[in-house]
Amino acid sequence: MKKKVTLACKNCGSRNYTTMKSSAALAERLEVKKYCNNCNSHTVHLETK
């Protein structure tokens, strides 16, 4: 079963993206490099609760 998670920019904290995460990988937090409109650059986005 997959769970819906929100990704927030590490620099500004803006919640820009949502994605689905496998329940098998729930122990570790997701970390993805994506584009942030507020920072106007590609930054690391972290999974939020």
Curated annotation (Swiss-Prot):
GO terms classed as biological process: translation
Keyword Ribosomal protein: yes
InterPro entries linked: Ribosomal_bL33, Ribosomal_bL33_CS, Ribosomal_bL33_sf, Ribosomal_zn-bd
Gene Ontology CC terms, in alphabetical order: cytoplasm; ribonucleoprotein complex; ribosome
PANTHER family hit by this protein: 50S RIBOSOMAL PROTEIN L33, CHLOROPLASTIC, LARGE RIBOSOMAL SUBUNIT PROTEIN BL33B
Originating organism: Bacillus licheniformis
Keyword Nucleus in annotation: no
Domain of life: Bacteria
Any one GO MF annotation of this record: structural constituent of ribosome
Name of the protein: Large ribosomal subunit protein bL33B
